[in-house]
């Protein structure tokens, strides 16, 4: 009887801890969130060079079958990026009203057009600028880089 009670208490404790933790987005949004992280988030401030873009675009699997023409890496902590989702909603390029804007440090990587996948070559441009991201879920998380 005591063992069963201990197991019940442990299960209750586990469920309580899970409940106190961050609420995870739904599976569909989680996949989009993970893709956003892979394609756009690099908290270290090591961007800015062509070499950086060439390496990161390859590491993040954006050059496997074709050279992605343009990509932006955000050099901010994920919590700073997620906080953008709590700003006022604005209209996205696709017409939806789930976009938000904020100012962050970025490296923009633009395909030079002189190479072929998987050995794509990029030009880098580092700056601090306004970005627009689409957010979904509860809590809201970034799922798409809109500009």
UniProtKB/Swiss-Prot annotation:
Gene3D superfamilies: Ribonuclease A-like domain. One of its GO terms (molecular function) is nucleic acid binding. Its EC number is 3.1.27.-. Coiled coil: none annotated. The active site is at 40 (proton acceptor), 144 (proton donor). Keywords: Antibiotic, Antimicrobial, Disulfide bond, Endonuclease, Hydrolase, Nuclease, Pyrrolidone carboxylic acid, Secreted, Signal. GO terms for cellular component: extracellular space. One of its GO terms (biological process) is antibacterial humoral response. Residues 1-28 form the signal peptide. Its main location: secreted. The modification Pyrrolidone carboxylic acid is found at residue 29. Disulfide bonds join 53-109, 67-120, 85-135, 92-99. DUMP binds at residues 35, 40, 68, 71-72, 145. It holds the Pfam family RnaseA. It is found in: Secreted. Cleaves preferentially after uridine bases. Has antimicrobial activity against uropathogenic E.coli (UPEC). Probably contributes to urinary tract sterility. Belongs to the pancreatic ribonuclease family. PANTHER family: RIBONUCLEASE (PTHR11437), RIBONUCLEASE 4 (PTHR11437:SF53). This is Ribonuclease 4.
């Amino acid at each position: 009887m005591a063992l069963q009670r201990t197991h019940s208490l442990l299960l209750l404790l586990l469920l309580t801890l899970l409940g106190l933790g961050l609420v995870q987005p739904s599976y569909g949004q989680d996949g989009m969130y993970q893709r956003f992280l892979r394609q756009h988030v690099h908290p270290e401030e090591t961007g800015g060079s062509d070499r950086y873009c060439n390496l990161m675009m390859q590491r993040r699997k954006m050059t496997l079958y074709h050279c992605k023409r343009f990509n932006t890496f955000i050099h901010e902590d994920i919590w700073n990026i997620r906080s953008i989702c709590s700003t006022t909603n604005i209209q996205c390029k696709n017409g939806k009203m789930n976009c938000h804007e904020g100012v962050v440090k970025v490296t923009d990587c633009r395909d030079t057009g002189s190479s072929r996948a998987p050995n794509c070559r990029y030009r880098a441009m580092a700056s601090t600028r306004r970005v627009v991201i689409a957010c979904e879920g509860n809590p809201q998380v970034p799922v798409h880089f809109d500009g």
